[in-house]
Every structure is written in C-alpha cells, then in structure tokens.
Regions:
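Iron-associated oxidoreductase/ferritin-like identity signal
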Residues: 1-180
Length: 180
C-alpha cells in the first residue's frame, strides 16, 4: 500500500479542516495563458463571422459562428479545470476587434492561429508531463481538438491554392464548396 493511501486512512483531528491541494503555480500560469489564447481565438472567429455576414458570405459566416462558439467552450473548459482545483482563473486582456480584407486572409490567419495554439498546448504538455500527470492528461483533449482544427484549415489553405482569391466569383464558388 502506498504511503499516501496509508496516511489517508489514519485518524485525524476532526477540528482541523484541511484545505484541498492546488495546482502548481507554473501549471496555473500556463493554463491562464491558454485561456487568453482561447479568448483571442473566440474574438477572432467572432470578428470573422461578423465580417462574413456583412460581406454576404453566409455559409462562411455560419462556419465562423460555430468556430467562435467552440473557442468560447474551450476557454470555459480551462477555467472550470482551474476552479475545480480551487484556483481562481486570471483572464488576460485580449484583442476583441479584428479587421479583415477578404475571406482568404481569414483562412490564412485562422490556420496560423490554430497551428500556434497546437504548438502552445504541445509545449505546455511537455513542461507539465513531469510535474502534473492529471493536467497533462487534461490537456491532451485540447491537443486533439487543435490538431483537428489545424488539419481542417490546412485543407482550406490547399483548396485556396486552386483559385484566384482576387476573383470574387471564384471565392463564392470556394465558399459554396468548402463551407456548404
């Protein structure tokens, strides 16, 4: 039987209330940074959806509406993880108003952002692996999600290579094919 389990079955003074264990400060700092990244992604996609709605890219707008909602869920999941560990999250300030020139630019920037998120989660997992297995396992879901997002945007980038992004008709065809 392990020492931890052996110690937990010994009688304790009922007048002493033990505080729960918390995550290490380094782990909390990394998760707070990812919360900021997820909110940045949320507002990026929210701005992309608004831009697409305004430009009548209706299918792309729906797609980016869903992306914004997903990123918000990711931020909320990270915050819940911290509060479940009795840690109050620190939500950093993020850019909330992003400007775009065209649909192709949104896709390129989204790919860069998703790839950056994937790299950040992967690097964080390497750091956390040796110090906190529970958080390491928790972050694997975020790596999986960002791997899927990165490959999805890579496919869109590849499809953009087939058209002239300066040609509005081709962009409308692209939107219909890949966001429909």
């Amino acid at each position: 039987m392990s020492t931890i389990i052996t110690e937990s079955i010994k009688p304790v003074d009922p007048t002493i209330i033990k505080k729960p264990n918390k995550l290490r400060k380094e782990v909390v700092n990394l998760i707070n940074q990812r919360i900021g990244d997820e909110y940045t992604a949320h507002y990026f996609y929210r701005s992309a959806a608004n831009w697409c709605h305004n430009m009548s890219y209706k299918k792309a707008a729906e797609f980016f509406d869903a992306e914004a909602a997903d990123e918000l869920l990711h931020a909320q999941g990270l915050q819940k993880y911290l509060t479940d560990w009795d840690v109050l999250p620190t939500i950093p300030k993020v850019e909330t108003n992003v400007q775009f020139e065209n649909l192709a630019e949104i896709i390129v920037r989204a790919y860069d952002m998703e790839f950056g998120l994937l790299q950040s989660y992967s690097e964080n997992s390497k750091v956390i692996f040796g110090m906190d297995q529970a958080t390491y396992i928790f972050l694997q879901e975020y790596i999986k999600q960002n791997t899927g997002s990165t490959t999805e945007y890579a496919d869109l980038l590849n499809a953009l290579q087939l058209i002239n992004p300066e040609n509005n008709f081709e962009l409308l065809y692209f939107e219909n094919q890949y966001f429909g």
